[in-house]
């Protein structure tokens, strides 16, 4: 599931091409018709679907129908900027993971890097966790901690954390399936 640039998706696609990677990406779903990540779906010939998020019920109903039709059993949220309902999550209990650009449980939600810098944290990082009905609150699978540099900006921090996300997401998937 994606909403934007798809850089974590691109990393997962590249890693999934390795014969040792434990999952195959069989479908990409987006709520944003302009999500740059959909270009990766086209480039790597991966089926994709776009469903408008005019209502969460409409979006989730269509997603569940498509996921069941394709017999997809595990979901990765990669920059998906919507909150899934309890009902949807219940259909995939401990089968949905997400990556978040902070060391959860700190700095849930949006604007993480700004909040981290405003709070004068010494460290930040990223977290892969199971999705639960509460925002960014599911059981933690893996985390990567990085030191915040002197004179760090939101943009430099965002780039550095994203680089770690690309590595951590695949490591987390491997740890789940091995």
Which sequence ranges carry the predicted segments?
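Donor/substrate-binding cores of folate-linked one-carbon enzymes
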Residues: 9, 15, 23, 74-178
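N-terminal glycine-/serine-/threonine-rich beta1-alpha1-beta2 phosphate-ribose binding loop
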Residues: 22-24, 29-70
